[in-house]
Swiss-Prot record:
NCBIfam families: PRK00558.1-5, uvrC. Residues 16-94 form the GIY-YIG domain. The gene is uvrC. GO terms for biological process: nucleotide-excision repair; SOS response. This is UvrABC system protein C.
Amino acid sequence: MTQTFDPGAFLATCSGRPGVYRMFDAEATLLYVGKAKNLKKRLASYFRKTGHAPKTGALVSRIAQIETTITGNETEALLLEQTLIKEWRPPYNILLRDDKSYPYVFLSDNAFPRLSIHRGTKKAKGRYFGPYPSAGAIRESLSLLQKTFQVRQCEDSYFKNRTRPCLQYQIKRCKGPCVGLVEPEVYAEDVRHSVMFLEGRSNALSDELNASMEKAAMALDFERAAELRDQVALLRRVQDQQSMDGGTGDVDVVAAFVNPGGACVHLISVRGGRVLGSKNFFPQVGIEEEVGEVMSAFLAQYFLGGIDRELPGEVIVNVINDDFPAFVDAVEELRGVEMVISHRVRGTRARWQQMAVTNAEQALTARLANRQHVASRFEALAKVLGLEDPPMRLECYDISHSSGEATVASCVVFGPEGPIKSDYRRFNIEGVTAGDDYAAMHQALTRRYSRIKAGEGKLPDVLLVDGGKGQMSMARDVLNELQVPELILLGVAKGTTRKAGFETLYLNDSAHEFTLPGDSPALHLIQQIRDEAHRFAITGHRARRGKTRRTSTLEGVAGVGPTRRRDLLKHFGGLQELSRASIDEIAKAPGISKKLAESIYANLHSE
């Protein structure tokens, strides 16, 4: 593709039918995918001499080839466009950076049903409620249900092996069905009430609970009446916090907001008239910077991209676009759902719409302000380090362990826009003396920079080490051993008071020692990155330590490998319950012989 692209010659043979077009650069890299009702007319608009946005002009200047695919109609073009965008993720397209499944509340189908969070395919027998826009929203609902109706949320394996009620019973978050502390019909009633709440029938539920409360009071069952009173009070509190008069339909409210710094789409999920929660999306804005184009791209990628996602019957938007009819047809063709897109709404729906618009504007404003704040800190750090330009990539390392147990090293990465979490890494440290932080850091840096030297990852401009002269010298030794190209090495040691704002800094070698004022933006950036590395290391260490403590007592038993160990713990609901089991009870577990049960029992009860 070395020849110059000739738009006139291309357009002379281009079809005027609906279809999809793909733009490539001279290296055959796909730059952009688009759709059109009339391919020739749409593509001709790119080659006008005036009226282009800067990003469109940049795209056109790189075009070396255009390929087209004619489709039967606009709907087919939309579906093909989304398939290609999802597969290739072209740099000039609006891209939705959210491809994970959304959580549901799952109610199991057994004698004493369990409420839990579920993601992925719906294989288990039971009922699913949702989807919820975030894990936080679903946890909030489950917490409320646990307080109000005390339906169990424990794993079935844990439930089946209880011999006495757990802590959840003591704090009134469960009625103890595992040990027979609640009658099946009473528990079933609590489950029915939970279902009413999850279906959005809170008003009917409140009326029913009020009637039951009055009935209990008339029967002088004041304990039951007080319990029902508390349930009604909790429900009223939720109703006061949410817009509840929107009917019983399922609605998603979507608002898009665009300014020169980026775009935000705010989505509110309403199921059965109840607001389940909301979520912000910050799509990568391509050449289409108009708010209507952002909305159109979001709807197509969000609703057509997740095949396992339940679709609402109505989507309320704050802007309209000519692509909406094709989108609605595509939803019906691909998913078999009749969807209505509403723009002019009244009453509660109008309040939801305005709420989404306000949240989108505020979220983008806050994001851009934070980005500007971080960028100013990077500029301040550049001055401190004597650099002409701010560094583009900072890495910081930290070590976490408990008296040498389960040592974990962390690596966090920051850029001018904030943390780059996709590049975070943890290292489980092995084969070093317990508590030897220098050896642990040496191993982590060696593993990290050996991979970078091999082409896996990017070198930072600044390497930040949480430690004093010893850690600095060790880091310099690793870089020299691996012949890593010159980069800035910055050590951060706590001052004599060990308080924030009094850190001692070491630049490149331990001889260059200095401090910064407590109000220095550069120091604030260093503290932010160091604290993030510390947090990331601690969470990794705690997870590793917990896993080790759960399984280490079984690791020495011959015949109990990782799979059997996992199955055994799942069968008994944890190590504590397994420790309480007799030899005969252990032998009843799948795949465990009497002889192996004796070995397990002896191992668990050895001093």
